[in-house]
């Protein structure tokens, strides 16, 4: 990876206040507003009775990280709009380095979002022990984000900057609803069947590992693996299509 280009991308990311606010502050505000008003309530999640702030912290950690990774597409669309990607293509920068840096920056924002939600959760009395559960939960969340990194790169090379707002907002809302990130989905029925086939469901399950839920079974790994491969292929196709047009 080109260290200079990676450093430049990180600096541009930090200076992009709109992306930072949407990716980091929005999930944090949801947690504070909803968990704060229900901090004395409990909720049953697949047989686990959790305090509401605990449930909402692990759910919002996945949701916020998902927003952060898909929002990477908005940065790509903005770069395309001003011709930045065209300029990069006449430099020695390889396609592999370009994609690797986009993945790195997406994960960097996602980690910031997760860390903010953890701090807010602890401030609201969330207690998870032993400490290894925090590590296991975070590691599984990062694995579960792989499809969404691909989605962000895909839509960033496919859509215009004007289309990205509705696409990111609507897409993350739909994934959050079907994946049980806003509220627990039923253990049976059509919604449960649909949820198990999309990566946001397993991202939610990854967060729940921290509070005693079992880790993914084979189905979870298959869903994440298939979606990751499909989104990586689509991201590559969208990049080549965009390159050919320019």
What are these regions (language model features)?
Residues 1-7, 181-221:
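Short hydrophobic, aromatic-rich alpha-helical segments embedded in or entering the lipid bilayer
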Residues 75-107:
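Helix-loop-helix units of permease transmembrane domains in multi-pass membrane transporters
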Residues 7-82, 110, 114, 126, ...:
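Transmembrane helix-boundary elements of multi-pass transport/secretion proteins
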Residues 35-36, 121-122, 126, 153-157, ...:
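Transmembrane helix-loop junction
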Residues 32-40, 156-197:
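Transmembrane helix segments
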Residues 95, 99-168, 174, 217-221, ...:
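Alpha-helical transmembrane segments and their short interhelical loops
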Residues 89, 93, 124, 159, ...:
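Short helix-loop-helix connector
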Residues 1-9, 45, 95-99, 126-130, ...:
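Juxtamembrane loop-helix boundary motifs flanking transmembrane segments in multi-pass membrane proteins
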């Amino acid at each position: 990876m080109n260290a200079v280009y990676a450093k430049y991308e990180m600096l541009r990311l930090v200076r992009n206040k709109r992306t930072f606010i949407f990716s980091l502050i929005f999930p944090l505000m949801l947690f504070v507003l909803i968990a704060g008003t229900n901090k004395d309530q409990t909720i049953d999640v697949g047989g686990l009775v959790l305090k509401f702030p605990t449930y909402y912290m692990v759910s919002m950690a996945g949701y916020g990280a998902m927003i952060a990774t898909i929002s990477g597409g908005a940065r790509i669309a903005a770069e395309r709009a001003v011709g930045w990607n065209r300029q990069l293509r006449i430099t020695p920068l390889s396609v592999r380095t370009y994609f690797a840096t986009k993945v790195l920056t997406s994960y960097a924002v996602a980690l910031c979002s997760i860390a903010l939600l953890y701090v807010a959760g602890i401030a609201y009395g969330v207690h998870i022990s032993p400490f290894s559960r925090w590590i296991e939960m975070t590691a599984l969340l990062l694995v579960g984000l792989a499809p969404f990194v691909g989605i962000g790169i895909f839509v960033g090379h496919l859509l215009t900057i004007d289309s990205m707002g509705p696409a990111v907002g609507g897409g993350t809302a739909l994934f959050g609803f079907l994946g049980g990130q806003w509220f627990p989905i039923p253990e049976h029925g059509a919604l449960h069947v649909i949820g198990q086939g999309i990566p946001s469901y397993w991202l939610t399950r990854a967060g729940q590992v921290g509070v005693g839920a079992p880790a993914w079974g084979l189905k979870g790994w298959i869903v994440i693996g298939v979606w990751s491969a499909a989104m990586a292929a689509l991201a590559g196709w969208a990049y080549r299509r965009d390159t050919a047009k320019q």
